[in-house]
Amino acid sequence: MPRSLKKGPFIDDHLIKKVELAVSNSDRRVIKTWSRRSTIAPEMVGLTFAVHNGKKFIPVFVTENMVGHKLGEFAPTRTFYGHAADKKSKAKK
């Protein structure tokens, strides 16, 4: 169920402060964050975030198409190595 429109998008307070500081200083350094749950706002376009995926920080450059999505959507947490090979077919060869 989506978030109520009257509440507005959720963005962590500490992340808002970092974004405002970066925009006011026109600072283009990477903003490190653990806040995967924060929604991407229009003010964040053009900034680069280092989003934590549980193991390391993934760099995410924000574009206009990302506005309205969550930061965590762009830093995958699971690694897919492929399905296990069929042992029977390998043994016959």
Swiss-Prot record:
GO terms for biological process: ribosomal small subunit assembly; translation. Gene3D superfamilies: 30s Ribosomal Protein S19, Chain A (3.30.860.10). It holds the Pfam family Ribosomal_S19. InterPro entries: Ribosomal_uS19, Ribosomal_uS19_bac-type, Ribosomal_uS19_CS, Ribosomal_uS19_SF. The keyword RNA-binding applies. The keyword rRNA processing does not apply. GO terms for cellular component: cytoplasm; small ribosomal subunit. Keywords: Ribonucleoprotein, Ribosomal protein, RNA-binding, rRNA-binding. GO terms for molecular function: rRNA binding; structural constituent of ribosome. Belongs to the universal ribosomal protein uS19 family. Protein S19 forms a complex with S13 that binds strongly to the 16S ribosomal RNA. This is Small ribosomal subunit protein uS19. It comes from Nitratidesulfovibrio vulgaris (strain DSM 19637 / Miyazaki F) (Desulfovibrio vulgaris). The gene is rpsS.
